[in-house]
Every structure is written in structure tokens, then in C-alpha cells.
Amino acid sequence: MKVLTAPLWELAEFEEGKALLDRGKGHVAFSGLYDSQKLHMVYGLSDGFTQKIIVTFSDKRAREIGAEYGFYDRRTMVYPGKDLIFYQADVSGGDLVRERMRVLRALLEKRPVTIVTTMSALMMPQTPLSGIVSRILHFDKKSTVDERKLSAQLVEMGYEKSPQVEEPGQFSIRGGIIDIFDMTEENPYRIELWGDSVESIRSFDVLSQRSVENLDEIAIYPATELMLSEARRQDGFARIKKETKQYAKKLREQGNPEAAHRIETQIKEIEESAQEFGSVVNLESSCIIFIRRRSPFWNFFIRKRRQFFWMSHSICRRRRTHLKQNFGRA
């Protein structure tokens, strides 16, 4: 929208800064801007870049910026951070994971996008994109499906098996009909089989069960960033239990048996949930234990197509220092 950027080009400082960014020459800083002016400036400076990353200091502020910047770019998405405290579950559960997976899908598909995130989310080590790509399932009308094998694959991908699909992250298999509610989609998919061959694929409304659209092919993205085989799951829990035992012993030696009992109980509940129901929501913040090859979020962008914008550089810098000192994230 040139009508929005035209006033900016009348500023010599903007023109100079834009030229430097376009050539990839160093960093540009602007001060004395109000919040609305900052977003206007970001919009102008980001012209020509297909991946725009706006970094702020908190999830609350990220959501505010995401809502405001949607005026400039409808492709704006918020990438929320995960809880940094070891063993603690994501309080937002599936909704938070869904937001993150939608952003990762946009990056995998190399779509133009503006991502609003926080310093902690940017630095958080997680499963590399290659690990997510290898788990994406593709179906078309030439596909054949082993229902038992597919069920095991979907559980590893973080999906929950249920009698009937009602919300994102669930799947059901019954009588040659496979329903999967992809975490990145608005409507679930229904795959109908003839024997083990795909006969039809369609999306449907979860409430009315009526068809929305007939499809030739679909891709099913993981419902979690933490996809674990049984062997990796067992190895991770063995390491957690060993560390928990040492920590509980230390707490009891310090005269705090109640805290020791709480941590042991919490770990036991998380393990039982993962074993019995295939739930990995409570394991997301323990990625560092289960995934040995990790990558920070900032590595997921294409270098020549990306541009970072720090909405409060001094606060973000202090946040980065805090994260490095307390959690060892570079």
C-alpha cells in the first residue's frame, strides 16, 4: 500500500535506513517513536522482505502488536513462547501449540509472512524444521493406508485418538473411515477407504459433519513439535527420573520432604499421561531432554529474505542476557 509508505519516503532518515537494510549493511535504529509510529516504520522498512520478524519482550505485548500490525499485513502471525521452567506444563495447552505449528507450517511452505514473537521464543532450542518435515503425512487418491500403522504414526505426531473428532489434534479410525483434525487447519479431514486404498478425501464441518470441500490431496502436519518414538521416549524419561531422584534427595537433605514428594508425584503423572494417552503437551518444555539435535527459532528463516525488527532493543537485550545466564541459551 504505497499510500501508507509515501509519507515515510519524505524522511531522509527513513530513506537512508531503508537503503542500508536493502543492501544488508549492518543495523538501523530509530528512537523517539510512539508505538503506532514504530509499526508504520516497520511496515515501510520491511518492504521487499518476505519474512519479517518483529521481536518484543512479552507474549502479551506480542499479541497486541500482532493485532495492530494486521492492519498493515493480513499475513501477520504470533509465535508465542513456551514455558521455560523445567517440568512445567504449557498452561495454554493445545491452543499455544496450534499457534506455533501454524507459524512453522508457513515457514516450511516458504510463504510470505510477518511473525511477531518474543526474545525467549526466538532463543528457545527446539526440534529443527527437518525433523518436522520428515513427519508430515501426505495422502492422495492413489495412496494406500495401513490403519494400524497410521494410528501409531499419528500418536507419535502428537495426535490424540478419540471415538469422534471434536477439536484440533484429534483423530479417529473406524470402519474404513479416517478423520484427522490437523492442528494447522480450520476444519478436519475425512479419508474414506475401499479396502486399504483411498477412495475419497474431503474436509467437513466438525459440528454438522457435513462436507465442506472435496480434495484431491492433503498434508497432515504434526500436532506437536516434540515427536517421540517409543525408544526416545523411554530414554528421555530415564534421564528425567534419574535427575528427579537426585533433586528429591537433595530436597529431603535440606529438610523439605513435601517439595520432594510433589516433584516426584508430578513427574510420575506426566509419565503416566504420556504412556497411557500418548500426550506430549506436558513434555514440550522438556525438549532439551528428549531432542538432542536442536535449533533456535531464529535459524528457521531464509537469510536473504528475512528481516528482524526489535521493538524495544534495550529490553530485548536485557532479556537475552537473562536467558543466557539462567538457561544457557545463546
Where are these regions (language model features)?
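ASCE RecA-like P-loop NTPase motor cores
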Residues: M1-A330
